[in-house]
Regions:
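Alpha-helical transmembrane bundles and membrane-interface segments of multipass inner-membrane proteins
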Residues: 1-175
Length: 175
């Protein structure tokens, strides 16, 4: 019973974090649509950073333009994979970071997925004009932070054997 209670607590926190972050992403996009669509950019730091409304029908750096069905399929596959991961991931303090990373990454995927389903494109609005960096949004920030977290976790925090929970094969008994 204690294990089930801990599992429910971890999954509950994972889901709450996903929902809060997805709502934050959608709220920022709603503000941008309301205040920036068909308007001039809002310059925050002249020559460096501004808010710029953009309807992105592709992926990062403009690849895969107008391939909505591909993004929908990939997001569904990703969501199935992350829920499998969260189901398999140990529910203890040692793995809290992985739960957080998976939840933040999922919020990023869901935020852009909702845009694609609802609008047919993703609303982007952060623009670093100084380096002409592609316009991005809060969900994109969640994805990037998550991938950095994954890299740091793999390289510096967890040992290889701590990822055995991801193995599909059954452990051989040491008899």
């Amino acid at each position: 019973m204690v294990k089930n209670k801990k599992t429910i607590q971890f999954i509950g926190v994972d889901c709450i974090l996903m929902v809060i972050l997805t709502l934050l992403d959608q709220w920022t996009k709603s503000l941008v649509v309301h205040h920036l669509k068909d308007q001039s950019d809002i310059i925050l730091i002249p020559g460096v950073f501004q808010l710029h409304y953009l309807e992105n029908r592709g992926a990062a750096f403009g690849i895969l333009q107008n391939q909505r069905i591909i993004f929908v399929i990939l997001t569904i596959i990703y969501l199935a994979a992350v829920f499998w991961f969260l189901h398999r991931c140990p529910k203890n303090g040692r793995y809290t970071l992985l739960h957080i990373i998976a939840s933040v990454l999922t919020a990023g995927a869901l935020g852009n997925f909702i845009d694609r389903l609802r609008l047919g494109y993703v609303v982007d609005f952060f623009y670093f004009s100084l380096i002409n960096f592609p316009v991005f949004n809060v969900a994109d920030i969640f994805v990037v932070i998550s991938f950095i977290g994954i890299a740091v976790s793999i390289l510096f925090i967890y040992k290889d054997d701590e990822f055995e929970f991801l193995s599909i094969r059954k452990k051989e008994s040491k008899a």
